[in-house]
Amino acid sequence: MPKLKNHSGSKKRFKFTASGLVKAQAAGKRHGMSKRPQKMKRNARGTFVMFKADGEKIAENFLRVK
């Protein structure tokens, strides 16, 4: 049976912390930013650590990490 390949898009979008949690970019910053409050834009800057359950799903289904 051939090797299962990792999801290419997921490899680019998610990173792991040293403790095994998953980091991702904040969503909702592609367009229409002039209508958004400054606080919302500021909070969407940088990366955030996903909830543990969501991170486990990403790792299992897309990145093939157990």
Swiss-Prot record:
Disulfide bonds: none
Keywords on record: Ribonucleoprotein, Ribosomal protein
GO CC annotations on file: ribonucleoprotein complex; ribosome
One Pfam family in the UniProt entry: Ribosomal_L35p
Keyword flag Nucleus: no
Record-level GO BP terms: translation
Biased composition regions of type Basic residues, renumbered to the chain: 28-44
The keyword Ribonucleoprotein is assigned to this record: yes
Location of the region described as Disordered in the Swiss-Prot/TrEMBL record: 25-45
GO molecular function, one term: structural constituent of ribosome
Family named by the database record: Belongs to the bacterial ribosomal protein bL35 family.
Descriptive protein name: Large ribosomal subunit protein bL35
Organism listed in the record: Rhodospirillum centenum (strain ATCC 51521 / SW)
Taxonomic lineage from the root: Bacteria, Pseudomonadati, Pseudomonadota, Alphaproteobacteria, Rhodospirillales
Annotated gene: rpmI
